[in-house]
């Protein structure tokens, strides 16, 4: 079941890729993908290229994929290990969701962080109290870690 669904999503992604994202298997293993997310223009991540690993569980799509940033990013919902705090990757997951929708949700999270459900409280505090400083730090990290 999982392999068929993953192949279907891969074909859809190749036919109709989401804006500023791409994804596909890293090798022969269909359960391990790498994705590329371009930093959204209207965000401090603009110009950055962010690499993301995607690991599908054997019971996909009934369980969410594990999605982890490989590129360091200064963000209240993404920690230093690359883990992402995003509801659809946890309790709000639905088998109706696809990797394409997950990637678009991550792009949206880059544009609009959720400081009320942070993975990194210190960054959430900066975001809430000094947005200019937050944006400068996010831009700085993007230039340091996400430019190719």
UniProtKB/Swiss-Prot annotation:
SUPFAM superfamilies, per database record: UBC-like
Domain UBC core: 1-147
EC number: 2.3.2.23
Pfam (any one): UQ_con
Listed SMART domains: UBCc (SM00212)
Alphabetical GO biological process terms: protein ubiquitination; ubiquitin-dependent protein catabolic process
One Gene Ontology molecular-function label: ATP binding
Biological pathway: Protein modification; protein ubiquitination
Keywords: ATP-binding, Nucleotide-binding, Transferase, Ubl conjugation pathway
Active site location: 85
Catalytic function, reaction form: S-ubiquitinyl-[E1 ubiquitin-activating enzyme]-L-cysteine + [E2 ubiquitin-conjugating enzyme]-L-cysteine = [E1 ubiquitin-activating enzyme]-L-cysteine + S-ubiquitinyl-[E2 ubiquitin-conjugating enzyme]-L-cysteine
Superkingdom per UniProt: Eukaryota
Recorded family membership: Belongs to the ubiquitin-conjugating enzyme family.
Biological function: Accepts the ubiquitin from the E1 complex and catalyzes its covalent attachment to other proteins.
Name of the protein this chain belongs to: Ubiquitin-conjugating enzyme E2 29
Lineage, broadest ranks: Eukaryota, Viridiplantae, Streptophyta, Embryophyta, Tracheophyta
């Amino acid at each position: 079941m999982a392999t068929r669904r993953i192949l279907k999503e891969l074909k859809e992604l190749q036919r109709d890729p989401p804006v500023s994202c791409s994804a596909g298997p890293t090798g022969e293993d269909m359960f391990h993908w790498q994705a590329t997310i371009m930093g959204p223009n209207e965000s401090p991540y603009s110009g950055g290229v962010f690499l993301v690993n995607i690991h599908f569980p054997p019971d996909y799509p009934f369980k969410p994929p594990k999605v982890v940033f490989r590129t360091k990013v200064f963000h209240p919902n993404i920690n230093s290990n690359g883990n992402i705090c995003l509801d659809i990757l946890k309790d709000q997951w639905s088998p109706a969701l696809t990797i394409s929708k997950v990637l678009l949700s991550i792009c949206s999270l880059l544009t609009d962080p959720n400081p009320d459900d942070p993975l990194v409280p210190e960054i959430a505090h900066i975001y809430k109290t000094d947005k200019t400083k937050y944006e400068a730090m996010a831009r700085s990290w993007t230039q340091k870690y996400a430019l190719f």
